Amino acid sequence: MKFTNFIKGFFLLNIFFLSIISAFVYFMDPYWTFSHSHKFNSLQNSTNEREQKSSLLYFQHKQYNALLLGTSRVTFINQNDFKNMNVFNYSFSLANPIELNEYIEFAKKQNKKDFEYIIIGLDFLGTNLNADKNQNPKEVFDEVTNPFYRYKLLLSIDAFTLSIENLKRSLLHKPGGRSYNRENVAFTTNFDPSEVKKRVEETSVEEQNSKLKNYKYDEDYKKILEKIKSSNPNSKFIVF
């Protein structure tokens, strides 16, 4: 009898803790699968922008007439600053031109129409054939569109840990390296100009060049960009 009561107690205790975790993750919503916003989730860590922004597109059911894509530099462009455009900023860290077409197609599907404008920020690193391989876009889309996705996250330890981090950032108003608000606008910690100058001066040319030691120009780079354009004949392209 005592053993049976122990098992019941242990089982109920686990349910209690799992319920608390689920409620907290739902309240914080670190992967943007729900729509509630409040002061406690006002800053969201950019842990996986591909998944988070795909989730936002999939679950929010909004329509846009322009799509913005690019690397981490482009994430800091405020999508609300474009005049006469309703833009969704779908840029993310280490974006590679070869994967952009699949993200555009996913965005068009959620948008339920073609984009009038597709804006792409390109940089030199995108021409590197030997760039690190990113997560397969199909894996991202399959994960986000899984019927159980948003509910699995409620019991995810990673989502729980991320929720705690987001709570800290929101309460302390410290975005860290990069955080987003609930409107998909990115923020970062502002450094004193003298500190920035000091860091730049301390960075050697050799250190910067070492990042390109495996660089090889992708001979198909132009073809990749041409495919993006030909796949979207109803869109006007703005490239910078």
Regions from the PLM with identified roles:
Residues 49-55, 100-109, 223:
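Short alpha-helical segments and helix-capping/turn motifs at coil-helix boundaries
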Residues 28-51:
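Alpha-helical transmembrane signal-anchor/signal-peptide segments
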Residues 118, 237-239:
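Hydrophobic/aromatic residues located in beta-strands of well-ordered beta-sheets
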Residues 42-48, 93-97, 214-217:
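Short, flexible loop segments at the rims of nucleotide/cofactor-binding pockets, characterized by
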Residues 122, 131-236:
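Secreted/periplasmic serine-hydrolase-like ester/acetyl group-modifying domain
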Residues 8-29:
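Hydrophobic membrane-insertion alpha-helices, especially the h-region
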Residues 44-68:
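Short extracytoplasmic
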Residues 65-154:
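Membrane-embedded segments
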